[in-house]
Amino acid sequence: MSTVLVVDDSSTLREMIAGLLLKAGLTVVEAKDGIEAQEMIEATPPDLVVLDIVMPNMNGYELCRWIKNTASTQAIPVIICSSKGEEFDRYWGMKQGADAYITKPFRPADMISTVKQLLR
């Protein structure tokens, strides 16, 4: 069973995404910011990370860049899930190494299909 780390400073959104992934049969762990996520990834690397951009301490762009520039974690797929929906935001997220970019609000089916596709 695959493990997904959901990183969002909003507990409501974090729990909503986690619930969606749990229903899809995935194991889910959660972090409230980039620093907590980094510590969790170093301790037990997940199979995939879903992260927000705007967070305290370490934003999603910084976390994505760290994941993709660290030899032991660079193969972990990253999905940026953010309310920042401008074309530049999507471009910048992908430039940081994200494997997918989903804009909030999103359709649950889109999140599940993107996660499952990247876990193959």
Predicted segments with their positions:
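Charged docking surfaces used in two-component/phosphorelay signaling
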Residues: E15-K23
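Short hydrophobic/Thr-rich beta-strand motif most characteristic of the beta2 strand and flanking loop
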Residues: G25-K32, M40
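Active-site beta3 strand of CheY-like receiver
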Residues: T44-V50
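Receiver (REC) domain active-site loop signature in two-component systems and cognate sites
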Residues: M55
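C-terminal output helix
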Residues: F106-V115
